[in-house]
Amino acid sequence: MAATSDPISPPVLFYDGDCALCHGAVRRLLRWECLNGKRPAAQPKLRFAPLDGHTAEALRKQGELPGHREAVILWTDQETAEGEAAVSAALRAIGRPRLAGAFGRLPAPLRRAGYRLTARYRHRWFGRVPAGCPLPADPARVLP
């Protein structure tokens, strides 16, 4: 949220801001959305914010977001998706339905188990984001 009086407009993908895997995934989603259709997206379809940031905290205080910080969360005006469901919904939102469909074709128990395993060991396997490695400074896309 750029200023405290600005409303937070959905959809927003909340991610672990310290996780190198999550950070890289957000960079990739930003790039894929911009390259969708071989031209920059005229109207961005997805915004991003860290789970431990000001935007997430404001929504938690309003009861809009769960209190935990173990899974990526896609917050929209209709629903809140978590974990592997949020990943699939984010891919569809940026115009990558084939990739979302491929992900969705995995059996649900396997998809959930794979997500939980990766989420549990993400810092050990992929590391943490160095302090001097911010996402692009685009307040319309990347929220605090």
Language-model features: where?
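A short helix-to-beta-strand connector/capping loop
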Residues: 42-45
